[in-house]
Amino acid sequence: MKNSSVKHTLTPLQQSLFSQLNDIMLVDQRRLSARIHGIGKIKSQEAQQAVAAEIQQQIEQARLRVEQRKSAVQNPIVFPESLPVSQRKVEIQKLISEHQVIVVAGETGSGKTTQLPKMCLELGFGNLGMIGHTQPRRIAARSVAARIAEELETELGGLVGYKVRFNDQISDNTQIKLMTDGILLAEIQNDRFLNQYSCLIIDEAHERSLNNDFILGYLKQLLPRRRRDLKLIITSATIDVERFSKHFNNAPIIEVSGRTYPVEVRYRPVVEEDDQDQLQGILNAVDELQAEGRGDILIFMNGEREIRDTAEALQKQNLKHTEILPLFARLSAQEQNKIFHPSGLNRIVLATNVAETSLTVPSIKYVIDPGTARISRYSYRTKVQRLPIEPISQASANQRKGRCGRVSEGICIRLYSEEDFNSRPEFTDPEILRTNLASVILQMTALGLDDIEAFPFVDAPDERHIQDGVKLLEELGAFETVQTKSGEKRLLTRVGRQLAQLPVDPRLAKMILSAVNFGCVYEMMIIVSALSIQDPRERPQEKQQASDEKHRRFADKKSDFLAFLNLWRYLQEQQKESSKNQFRRQCQKDFLNYLRIREWQDIYHQIRLTVREMSLPINSEKAEYQQIHTALLSGLLSHIGLKEAEKQQYLGARNAHFAIFPNSVLFKKQPKWVMAAELVETSKLWGRMVAEIEPEWIEPLAEHLIKKSYSVPLWSKSRGAVIADEKVTLYGVPIVAVRPVNYGAIDPTVSREIFIQSALVEGGWNTKHKFFKENQRLVREVEELEHKSRRRDILVDDRTLFEFYDQRIGTEVVSQKHFDTWWKKAQQKDPELLNFEHSFLINDDAEQVSKLDFPNFWHQGNLKLKLTYQFEPGTDADGVTVHIPLPLLNQVEMTGFDWQIPGLREELVIALIKSLPKSYRRNFVPAPNYAQAFLSRAVPLEKPLLDTLIYELRRMTGVTVEAEHWNWEQIPSHLKMTFRVVDENGKKIAESMNLDELKFNLKDRVQESISAVADDGIEQSGLHIWSFADLPQCYEQKQRGFSVKAFPAIVDEKDAVGIKLFETEFEQSVAMQQGLRRLLLLNVPSPIKYLHEKLPNKAKLGLYFTPFGRVLDLIDDCIACAVDKLIADFGGFVWDEAGFEKLRDFVRENLNEVTVDIAQKVEQILTLTYQLNQRLKGKMDFTMAFALSDIKSQLAGLVYQGFVQKSGYDRLPDLQRYLQAVDKRIDKLAQDVNRDRAAMLRVEQVQQAYQQLLAKLPKSKPISDEVAEIRYMIEELRVSLFAQQLGTKYQISDKRIGNIISQY
């Protein structure tokens, strides 16, 4: 309202000044208009006059400038009549004068690019402002400016100038300004209304570049609102010009035809069914065209590789008077120039689609069009720029056809059908529909054009592409979303404003900004400027190896980016030491494009200038690898890659899979993590310009983008906190596969619940708080009752305990550390706040458990063994466990354990009754009643449980149950005692339900433990006389509160004796017999001499019948037997020195005679054995085979090495009788084999039962004398069956032996 009132109240002075502004330049009009408005704010009349005079002077100066601009064009402007556009000059100038916007359509060569600016200049549009003329490429802007200046006969940079990125040839007198569309776009930021221009020519609009489409959209808004005086001329090839007209309210179109000749179109589709491919189709087309007559051929190809393959195939054709010329963007300037300098030979030009509209290849008569091209297309799915090969549009196909109608009639061969052509889209999609829009969106937002969706583009971009552009800018930190009353609004951040200031792609700009934080701005400016241009390193087709060797000097082992830094340093050194021409030649030798090097340097200096203007610090110290690549990474977060196992590819953002491009230094190395400057899809998705990175660099840069997921949180006792495994991903790439994190900060509620349950309820934490220890003690007491009674209903459930703590503990407590802080204050108010009461832990309906039924200790003699209870069905130690200290294992007997503890005894008896076969079990139904009756009568532990049970059941029912009928396998494991042997710290050594098995397996360890607790000196070795103290028959030692009992004995060491402690009295007895015998033999004269003197010759000869080695060994066996007899005759073992001396004298006195006596008996045994063996060697009937085999087995068991001592003196006569019985059996065998067989079967049955008994006996115990006697009872049975006439030692039968065996 204030501004409008000012306008309506202009003073006469102001009105006078405003009336003079129409004749001065637009920029001056805007500047002075603001000053004239300012006069109205000055109160002093005198001051107003002074300012007005100053403004008047500036108006005069501005008028003078306009006059100078008018007079700058002195010569008449010439328009070449040969150009089609010149012939329409009057019509075109009339349209320009009458309309704000016009569209000029014409093919390349019509002259519109060079003549339209001259027409506008002639109309005077250069007087009050510049005639702006945009070109899609920098080289075109420079060359067109030079051409127009030449035609106007003026110096470049004066009347005609140009401005491209980082190169400005403009002066105050410039009226025609050539520039790239990117320059005009950048100028809009500082000159939003384009006041420096009176006319704009947007050339090559048909290319539909992103910049051009944005400029046209911007002008669509600007012209009718702010710049009705601004003229706009849109030039285009004859492609979809109506679209431009409609965009500007049906602006008039004038079509200027180029100089063209008729072109014949021939369709020669490649037929796959005929095994014909595109290359063969091209070769066929070349043959067909050469047959038409001489003329240059232009063949359109998809890319560099196809061009080289086709060139190689054509060279093999040996075409006469023909040269083959490639044309593509990466080609060196020298090779490109060959196209424009005919050599006189027929030329075949192989070109990419750059030759469609942007570049005129002269003298083309024929065109071969395969109908495809690589078209840059943004993939919404993968978020990468693809370069797929696609069928070209009809408009592009017609442009290609038009290349050959310029100099004469031409022929265009299309390698596809006419139907294919007619089915194709009419026009190629504009760039805005197939590219990432991040840069445009950033610039628009910086210009205040926030509503991108409403912006009047010629063709509105895909909404998804807009969102992707926004997401990329969010990735770079350029945008932030704020909540307003009207909803969410996207605002430019400080970083975003800085990105918009830097004249490079947003990704590259982000790298420079990040370099500030990492101290590598200098290096980043070099790399970013290199990434902004085409690679200056050239690789000519015929010199690939040589160029590769030159470029390899600059390579870095880990990064393609660092090659630019190395190259930059090299170029700086070369420039210092060389003149300009020398440097140019050196670049050529090094296969470096000189113009691109200059462009690189120009861009670097422009970036450096911008960086300084933004006051960003530039480092002077050299940056390290990590600094540089972390800064690069900040702009390439969606271009990271994780190596996939066993594949030559990487997992990229959004599940993309890409490979490293073959020209990378990392192509063969394939590190685990990489980043790529760009991802481009051709035959596959390639990562170009790659470097090795570390995953830990990523997360700090991508905090706003990463996603975190967590495993199920668990309590960590060691950390005293709730921990979860965190997985960190960036666009789906796992940058942290797994790491433990404190879950308390992530979800306090869940963490508090887990803390209470795991730490307080379940006890899983390390703490010294008194309340907790007391609570745990009370819980253990109640749990022990549950284990004892094998019930789960005594202790209150975890939920009750959880609620107890939950109601009392602060909500902020999520870990042990938090608890300690809270409890320090809380206990001051109520120290017993968290204490359990015993009654609180017991369920109201739980029955009481008697300590008598479930004792804590088992008493056996003087032993007191700890009992523990475990109610864990299915586990090894389910039930009652007896804890036996290792040194006491030898003292514990199985006696009594079969009765179980009182609390389980009834259940055990019931289970035993139910284990009986049905024929017996039915006599004791119901089993619980009989179990109760049995327990009321029996005296526990007095006799073995089964013996007592058999007796009582027989008393109650009259039914006798045999021992073998009880099936212990069916008895539940918890009813069987578990024996656990423990070390001195109570730690388990071994565990089993078989006590004898434990004793056998741990025998050596028990022996070691007994020796370990013995007094020094009690165990000895290397003794030859009784030089030691009296031996106690039982040795006891206290250890850790229990009595360790052992049994010392003299042990045989062959040449000496020793003293050793044994676990049992039986082991002591066996060892003492051998040890005492050896000590006596060491202290009495040997009887061998006496034996030689007194033994009859016959007896001596008989001894030689021994089949067991040396006769001396047999004699030693006899002597040992004699000593054993004398010890027994003396009264047994002696335990002191005095007793030993008496025994020694007794043995010395009687040893000779007893030895001779034994030797004579042994001679008779050996002689008889020899005779029997001789009889067995004779011929026998086959029917006697089983009997003879049995006899041989019997003889081997009677007479063997060491049989004399082992049998003993009293058994020798029996051995002789047993052998005589064998002789009688052999006599009878021939008479009645069947009778022998029947008797042998009776013996075999008894022998088999005896062997089963031996297998069943505990391994930990030696065989008792009683069991050993059964072996001789079987020999007596043989005498009774085979030689009854010899008589037996006592009454014997197989039944009697069976009854004795069954008792075990």
UniProtKB/Swiss-Prot annotation:
A motif (DEAH box) lies at residues 203-206. Its EC number is 3.6.4.13. It comes from the Bacteria. Residues 281-448 form the Helicase C-terminal domain. InterPro entries: AAA+_ATPase, DEAD-box_helicase_OB_fold, DEAD/DEAH_box_helicase_dom, DNA/RNA_helicase_DEAH_CS, Helicase-assoc_dom, Helicase_ATP-bd, Helicase_C-like, HrpA_C. Pfam families: DEAD (PF00270), DUF3418 (PF11898), HA2_C (PF21010), Helicase_C (PF00271), OB_NTP_bind (PF07717). One of its GO terms (molecular function) is RNA helicase activity. Belongs to the DEAD box helicase family. DEAH subfamily. PANTHER family: ATP-DEPENDENT RNA HELICASE, ATP-DEPENDENT RNA HELICASE DHX37-RELATED. This is ATP-dependent RNA helicase HrpA homolog. The gene is hrpA.
